[in-house]
UniProtKB/Swiss-Prot annotation:
GO function terms (MF aspect): beta-catenin binding
The protein's name: Cytospin-A
Region (Disordered): 1-176, 293-323, 358-390, 920-997
Family note: Belongs to the cytospin-A family.
Comp. bias (Basic and acidic residues): 120-131, 158-171, 946-956
Length: 1117
């Protein structure tokens, strides 16, 4: 029997040794558990050596306990292998090392299960043989009683076997449920490292316990107490594994709640960003959505260690914008789950980085199946987590800096866009009021035209009546009547044309006004819808917060339940320790019984056996109660697992709903963008239409006959200047020729002197005196030449300034007259004392009334041509040197203001026409006109030509005026009254653009570059500073904080003032001082404080933009 037991026990020993070796290879940390297992084996071996026989009761109880132990362990050994096999199809990318480790684990599991089955079958056969031998050895006297006891024991054994089978089925169900729950928890959580370590720990414990049980059973056959001790030792292990699972579930619930909190925070951030973009980006369609996001790729580092994943994804991501907030939910959540599985340093980095991913591109993270399938890789990441965390912190710092720059640029551009939108709204309101006023004037004009047409019809009937009377009385009427009737016909035709044009323009303006009102209503409706959408999103956010609060309450309840279970397990552990002590006592008693039995006192043995049976029954009842408590504990664990599954389902549904809402919001945002683009194009079209209509209205009111005089005057001036230039050139040529002749004479004279130097010393002295005289005359001639050149330049500059002043004053007078015309404030066309006739609606009506009633005056009014001098802008500073710029800006700064010059303007009505023409023709014209667009200058010249024709016509009319030709003068007087206003000398497009550029110099720049004024000025600065080193202008705050941008911009115009190659970005104060001094040297006043610019990293972008606008206005307009 000993040989058989040894041979049978050798198989579990080998398997146990191989299992412990593989366990040590997989996880060296579990050596402590193996050592404790060895300690447990020694007392069992000693007990087996001291005991050779046992009673049938102890053998029956031991057999039942062994069956339970083997069944439970067999099922538990299959459970850990089933969970990875269920999760294995979900893995997509696993390295070869992980595959090898999982393969070895599965092979060891299979060998363990087969070894356990074989050992259990051999133990059953050995127990049967021992029972038969012991029944034969019993004495024949007590055989009857023993047979009765055997029958009872067999019945009790069958009952215990039924109980064991039931407990087996229950334990099998519980183990299968636990395996399913473990698979679910693994699928939900990405904490692969923790789960893997715990699974390996449990496997090593199972192997150690199986090795201990095999050794104890093989070396002590029939040792019921040692096997019962093994059962009692196994039950706390099962409870401890259950508690470990509960703790894991609790941590998983905490992590899920943290994820929900982070997701709620992300949703709030996205709502704020979305509301901000909807409210403040109505006029900027090409803006903050232009930042492109590079697609991050999974680098090899994310398979070798977890820290590399964070580093590679930070390096692979690009700067984002507010659009990326609405499209990267899933990746952000996966990244958050993956970062929670790192150690403390990496988890801190991930907590720092997580809110960054909610406002920019979401980082690419490995999937849950990949992170589950790599336990060995997760273990290897500890070594590289420190380096990866340092790299991650550096990358995060750089990323935070980039995102701050993008955020400040975006806010700056949004504020500039809002300001421009407010300006455009104000301009639109002004244009609407202007259109309304023009419409009212047109209504008045139409009424007056209707009245005049009625009067015309009445007068025509009277004329017919008077003609019929004259024909009846045979009285011949004069030819002047025919002339007068022709004049009335011409007036009638003019009235009809004006009425038709006014009606057509009124219809056009009404259509434009209706279109603008409809567009405004649509914009208000879209704004209202956007506000409603924002309110709905806020309500949804509140609902999500309430859900999270309820989840937190559930989590607190689960934590309390877990504490209760811990307390229960602690009490059970205390009870088990007490039972172990009792078991030791019982072992001692059994040893005493064996000794007494050997001595031969059987009566005492019977009493002791009865007491032992009673103690055994008590111990069995206590064990059954403990098993019931264990069953209750497992049921509670199942309920907790169900609650966790429900929470997970709710979380998945909530996540899907959030994704759908985000997609809907993205679609709504795209629609709003497209609508905004369409409205922007419609708005620009409307502006162009308004400008064109305004031009047409002004052109219909202006008379186009003022161009020839200005052109002829300019041609005469150019001819005179050319003649003067030729005269000066002839004088210079004569002086040069005289100089050459004198120098030739001097050389000849010197040659003669050299030949006769010995003979004529006295002639030499005379010649030297003549040489001195000639040099003095030459110097005087040169000085005279220089004086003449300077006088010529002064005359030219004076004439240019005078001519520019006349043109500038003329433009101002034109605008004043236009304002007077619009306000309806003017004097009558027929007034002989008026020197500045401005035809308005009322004056036209009065002129039409007086044309048919009052005789014409003796002299017609001479139209005014304001040509008084005014200050003119200097040429661009880039075209002259700094010294010349100072000399030019001197007299201009001391010039009189425009109003004073316009008040001192002479009254050309009091000057004779011949003197006026002589003064105009003799006045010099500049060689180059001021810097205005070519089209505007051409229009000004054409208008001036028409004004000259009007003046000539007025002169001829004044000279040829007589009482006999008053009717002819009356015929042309409406044309004169309409054409005599200086308003006609400038086209409305030119006037509106000049007015707009004087008010806002960035409007032309915005038309040139497109987009908003801020972006246009930014592009202009980038174009000007292109090619300069260390210059990157992306905004008007941080890009200008070192002063190099100012220096580069001013260096393009003033290279003599700024030594750009010597500048350094560290010396900010010197850069700002150089730039501001250079700007002040040409008259640009500094509006920025040097100390504030040096101190702050982000100066006020509005102040910087105003200063750059002043630079652009000075040098480019």
């Amino acid at each position: 029997m000993k040989k058989a037991s040894r041979s049978v026990g050798s198989v579990p020993k080998v398997s146990a040794i191989s299992k412990t070796q593989t366990a040590e290879k997989i996880k060296p940390e579990n050596s402590s558990s193996a050592s404790t297992g060895g300690k447990l084996v020694k007392p069992g071996t000693a007990a087996s050596l001291s005991k050779t026989k046992s009673s049938d009761d102890l053998l029956a109880g031991m057999a039942g306990g062994v069956t339970v132990t083997n069944g439970v362990k067999g099922k538990k050994s299959t459970c850990p292998s089933a969970a990875p096999s269920a999760s294995a199809p979900a893995m997509t990318t696993v390295e070869n090392k992980s595959k090898i480790s999982t393969g070895t684990a599965s092979s060891t599991k299979r060998s363990t299960s087969t070894g356990n089955k074989e050992s259990s079958s051999t133990r059953e056969r050995l127990r049967e043989r021992t029972r038969l031998n012991q029944s034969k050895k019993l004495p024949s006297a007590g055989q009857g009683a023993n047979d009765m006891a055997l029958a009872k024991r067999s019945r009790s054994r069958t009952a215990t076997e039924c109980d064991v089978r039931m407990s087996k089925s229950k334990s099998d169900n519980q183990i299968s449920d636990r395996a399913a729950l473990e698979a679910k928890v693994k699928d939900l959580l990405t904490l692969a490292k923790t789960k893997d370590v715990e699974i390996l720990h449990l496997r090593n414990e199972l192997r150690d316990m199986r090795a201990q049980l095999g050794i104890n059973e093989d070396h002590s056959e029939g040792d019921e107490k040692s096997e019962k001790e093994t059962i009692m030792a196994h039950q706390p292990t099962d409870v401890e594994s259950t508690l470990l699972q509960l703790q894991e579930q609790n941590t998983a619930i905490r992590e899920e709640l943290n994820q929900l909190k982070n997701e709620n925070r992300m949703l709030k951030d996205r709502l704020n960003a979305l509301g901000f973009s909807l409210e403040q980006r109505l006029d900027n369609s090409e803006k903050l959505f232009g930042y492109q996001s590079l697609s991050p790729e999974i680098t090899p580092g994310n398979q070798s260690d977890g820290g590399g994943t964070l580093t590679s994804s930070v390096e692979g991501s690009a700067p984002g914008s507010v659009e990326d907030l609405l499209s990267q939910d899933e990746n952000t959540l996966m990244d958050h789950q993956h970062s929670n599985s790192m150690d403390n340093l990496d988890s801190e980095c991930s907590e720092v980085y997580q809110p960054l991913t909610s406002s920019d591109d979401a980082l690419d993270a490995p999937s849950s199946s990949e992170s589950e399938g790599i336990p060995s890789i997760e273990r290897s990441r500890k070594g590289s987590s420190g380096n990866a965390s340092e790299v991650s912190v550096a990358c995060l710092t750089e990323r935070i800096h980039q995102m701050e720059e993008n955020q400040h640029s975006t806010s700056e551009e949004l504020q500039a866009t809002l300001q421009e939108l407010a300006d455009l709204q104000q301009i639109t309101q002004e244009l609407n009021s202007e259109n309304e006023r023009l419409g009212e004037e047109k209504v008045i004009l139409m009424e007056s035209l209707c009245q005049q047409s009625d009067k015309l019809e009445h007068f025509s009937r009277q004329i017919e009546y008077f003609r019929s009377l004259l024909d009846e009385h045979h009285i011949s009427y004069v030819i002047d009547e025919d002339v007068k009737s022709g004049r009335y016909m011409e007036l009638e035709q003019r009235y009809m044309d004006l009425a038709e044009n006014a009606r057509f323009e009124r219809e056009q303006l009404l259509g434009v006004q209706q279109h603008l009102s409809n567009t405004l209503k649509m914009a208000e409706q879209d704004n209202k819808e956007a506000q409603e959408m924002i309110g709905a999103l806020k309500e949804r956010s509140h609902h999500m917060e309430r859900i999270i609060e309820s989840e937190q309450k559930g989590k607190a309840a689960l934590a309390a339940t877990l504490e209760e279970y811990k307390a229960t397990v602690a009490s059970d552990q205390i009870e088990m320790n007490r039972l172990k002590a009792q078991l030791e006592n019982e072992k001692q008693k059994v040893a005493e019984l064996y000794s007494i039995h050997n001595s031969g006192d059987k009566s005492d043995i019977q009493d002791l056996l009865e007491s032992v049976r009673l103690d055994k029954e008590k111990a069995e009842t206590l064990a059954s109660s403990l098993q019931e408590d264990l069953a209750h504990t497992r049921n509670d664990a199942n309920r907790l697992q169900d609650a966790i599954a429900k929470v997970e389902d709710e979380y998945r549904a909530f996540q899907e709903e959030a994704k759908k809402q985000i997609e809907d919001l993205n679609m709504t945002l795209e629609k709003l963008r497209s609508d905004l683009d369409e409205k922007e194009t419609e708005r620009s079209d409307m502006k162009e239409t308004i400008f064109e209509l305004e031009d047409e209205v002004e052109q219909h009111r202006a008379v186009k006959l003022h161009d020839n005089l200005i052109i002829s005057d300019l041609e005469n001036t150019v001819k005179k200047l050319q003649d003067q230039k030729h005269d000066m050139e002839r004088e210079i040529k004569t002086l040069h020729r005289r100089l050459r002749e004198e120098s030739a004479e001097w050389r000849q004279f010197q040659a003669d002197l050299q030949t006769a130097v010995v003979i004529a010393n006295d002639i030499k002295s005379e010649a030297q005196e003549e040489i001195g005289d000639l040099k003095r005359r030459l110097h005087e001639a040169q000085e005279k030449n220089e004086k003449l050149t300077k006088e010529l330049e002064e005359i030219k500059s004076r004439k240019q300034e005078e001519e520019r002043g006349r043109v500038y004053n003329y433009m101002n007078a034109v605008e004043r007259d236009l304002a007077a015309l619009r306000q309806g404030m003017g004097l009558s066309r027929r007034s002989s004392t008026s020197s500045e006739p401005t035809p308005t609606v009322k004056t036209l009506i009065k002129s039409f009334d007086s044309a048919s009633q009052v005789p014409n005056p003796a002299a017609a009014a001479i139209p005014r041509t304001p040509l008084s001098p005014s200050p003119m802008k200097t040429p661009p500073a880039a075209a002259v040197s700094p010294m010349q710029r100072h000399s030019i800006s001197g007299p201009i700064s001391t010039s009189k203001p425009l109003t004073a010059l316009s008040d001192k303007r002479p009254n050309y009505g009091e000057i004779p026409v011949q003197e006026h023409l002589l003064r105009t023709s003799s006045a010099s014209r500049p060689a180059s006109l001021p810097r205005v667009p070519a089209m505007e200058s051409a229009k000004t010249l054409s208008v001036s030509r028409r004004s000259s024709e009007e003046v000539k016509r007025d002169i001829s009319a004044q000279e040829g005026a007589s009482p006999a030709s008053l009717m002819a003068m009356g015929t042309t007087s409406p044309q004169l009254s309409l054409s005599s206003s200086p308003t006609a000398s400038v086209t409305p497009t030119t006037r509106s653009r000049i007015r707009e550029e004087r008010k806002d110099p960035l409007s032309a720049l915005a038309r040139e570059y497109g987009g908003s004024k801020r972006n246009a000025l930014l592009k202009w600065c980038q174009k000007k500073t292109e090619g300069y080193q260390n210059i990157d202008i992306t905004n008007f705050s941080s890009s200008w904080n070192d002063g190099l941008a100012f220096c580069a911009l001013l260096h393009t115009y003033l290279p003599a003032h700024i030594p750009y190659q010597e500048l350094n970005s560290q010396d900010k104060r010197r850069n700002f001082m150089l730039a501001f001094q250079a700007a002040e040297s040409v008259g640009i006043k500094s509006t920025l404080d040097i100390n504030e610019m040096v101190r702050t990293e982000r100066p006020d972008w509005q102040n910087v933009m105003l200063y750059v606008t002043a630079i652009y206005k000075y040098f480019e307009t």
